[in-house]
């Protein structure tokens, strides 16, 4: 598949001459390439993934809106199944980079800008990403195919229902919804937020919970994260609702991987990723007080 994606990259109509794509690591659901054609470009090859509620037309619209908001690189070309971005020269962050107050003080304003500014630039129909509906859809898909972990689905969905009640009423922002460290690039002067395939309207708590869970922030840093975002001391109610959404984020990552075991063909150990995230979900869920 990677060679097929490379051939597709070479054939894109935007190039001024022959190009030789260089594979870039990091993608676990797409093929990514660096292309030099007078300047450097980042190429992302990926089809719609209905099983993950990923539609590339929404990703393209979100990517363009994120660029207009000043937080993501420019989309210079798009064809069905392919997007070409201006390449950002910089360092992709690692989870340990996020585990400092200094970095959180840089990341949180970027996330808040995404939440508040992208709706002003998004054009066309816009998606909503409600993690609990995603979990319901994943559970139905996994049960239908008799996934190897299907016996645990009723318990996971009971947990999801409890978490949804704990989250309660929400504010609506435009979320990134996949805040892995690998989606943040530091060019030495500023941060960029990339990879908008899951972008959609959501609660800000999901991005905050995902940022914490994906990068294993300490409890003290989690409180600091909430203080920076909401610009107010953290209340017990906010902390409780945030922790519930964080648990939902971990369960979604685990069930995303369970579905990916069946449907994705990228060379990646999805079963190990499933096990890792289920373990993290179980540990986080066990710490929640009864509602």
What residue spans do the PLM features occupy?
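Start-of-helix signal in alpha-solenoid helical-repeat scaffolds, especially tetratricopeptide repeats
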Residues: 240, 244-247
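ATP-binding pocket architecture of kinase catalytic cores
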Residues: 22-130, 134-152, 169
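Active-site activation/catalytic loop segments of kinase-like enzymes and analogous catalytic loops
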Residues: 205-234, 247-265, 280
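Active-site acidic catalytic loop and adjacent metal/ATP-binding pocket
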Residues: 22-38, 42-43, 161-206
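An alpha-helical support segment within catalytic cores of ATP-dependent transferases
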Residues: 2-20, 116-177, 187, 227, ...
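ATP/Mg2+ or Mg2+-diphosphate-binding catalytic cores
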Residues: 141-151, 255-291
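A general structural signal marking secondary-structure boundaries and capping sites
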Residues: 111-122, 167, 215, 233, ...
């Amino acid at each position: 598949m990677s060679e097929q994606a490379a051939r597709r990259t070479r054939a894109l109509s935007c190039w001024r001459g022959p190009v030789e794509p260089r594979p870039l690591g990091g993608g676990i659901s797409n093929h990514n390439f660096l292309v030099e054609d007078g300047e450097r470009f980042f190429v992302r090859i990926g089809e719609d993934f209905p099983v993950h509620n990923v539609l590339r037309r929404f990703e393209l619209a979100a990517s363009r809106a994120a660029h207009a908001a000043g937080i993501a690189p420019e989309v210079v070309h798009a064809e069905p199944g392919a997007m070409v971005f201006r390449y950002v020269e910089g360092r992709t962050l690692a989870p340990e980079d996020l585990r400092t107050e200094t970095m959180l003080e840089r990341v949180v304003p970027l996330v808040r800008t995404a939440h508040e500014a992208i709706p002003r630039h998004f054009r066309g129909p816009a998606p909503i990403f409600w993690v609990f509906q995603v979990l319901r859809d994943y559970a139905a898909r996994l049960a239908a195919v008799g996934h190897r972990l299907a016996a645990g689905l009723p318990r996971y969905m009971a947990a999801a229902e409890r978490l949804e009640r704990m989250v309660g009423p929400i504010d609506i922002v435009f979320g990134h919804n996949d805040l892995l460290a690998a989606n943040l690039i530091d060019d030495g002067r500023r941060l960029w937020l990339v990879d908008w395939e899951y972008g959609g309207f959501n609660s800000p708590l999901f991005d905050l919970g995902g940022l914490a869970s994906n990068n294993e922030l300490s409890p003290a840093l989690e409180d600091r994260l909430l203080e920076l975002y909401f610009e107010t001391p953290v209340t017990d109610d906010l902390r409780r609702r945030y922790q519930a959404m964080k648990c939902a984020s971990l369960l979604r990552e685990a069930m995303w991987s369970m579905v990916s075991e069946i449907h994705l063909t990228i060379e990646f150990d999805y079963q190990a990723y499933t096990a890792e995230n289920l373990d993290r979900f179980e540990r986080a869920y066990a710490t929640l007080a009864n509602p």
